[in-house]
Amino acid sequence: MDFVNNDTRQIAKNLLGVKVIYQDTTQTYTGYIVETEAYLGLNDRAAHGYGGKITPKVTSLYKRGGTIYAHVMHTHLLINFVTKSEGIPEGVLIRAIEPEDGLSAMFRNRGKKGYEVTNGPGKWTKAFNIPRAIDGATLNDCRLSIDTKNRKYPKDIIASPRIGIPNKGDWTHKSLRYTVKGNPFVSRMRKSDCMFPEDTWK
């Protein structure tokens, strides 16, 4: 997948259905991306790179597309895939995963079962046992990788405003969150909108 030359919004859509693999020391975790958010850098008031701000914690966001930007929010580890060329702080937040391999270990790691295991940006990273130290690593050159060949394809994609970013003017309302329609592993999914996971893919 080209993380440098494509538009960040398009990358966020293209990532839906892509297989994520995390190889721990004794356990392999896999699942399919069902929810993403695009963050558009310098002009995006909700982005960590807004206005060109650089601090030690966001250094990875300014690296070349394909870098992993991992940051902690409210004690939860959030994983972003950096996009664009070095120096342009854009990226895609991976918000939710439909789990596949390593389910029993995920249940242990999370202390939860069912859709709650991976239906949020801090939930799936805890389920996969991903450490903060992965920040700055290159996707597919470390324990975290994606498989764009053995993937799924959404039947429908819904675009909506991003979660949890009030008071950012127009950026609060821009439809930069992308979800697999009806997939029950999407965060904040209403039960009435849920479908069986297998019915949400082509």
Curated annotation (Swiss-Prot):
Domain of life: Bacteria
UniProt xrefs under SUPFAM superfamilies: FMT C-terminal domain-like (SSF50486)
GO biological process, one term: base-excision repair
Pfam families: Pur_DNA_glyco (PF02245)
InterPro entries for the chain: Formyl_transferase-like_C_sf, MPG, MPG_sf
EC number: 3.2.2.-
GO MF annotations, alphabetized: alkylbase DNA N-glycosylase activity; DNA binding
Keywords for this protein: DNA damage, DNA repair, Hydrolase
NCBIfam families hit by this protein: 3mg
HAMAP family: 3MGH
Family from the record: Belongs to the DNA glycosylase MPG family.
Name of the protein described by the UniProt record: Putative 3-methyladenine DNA glycosylase
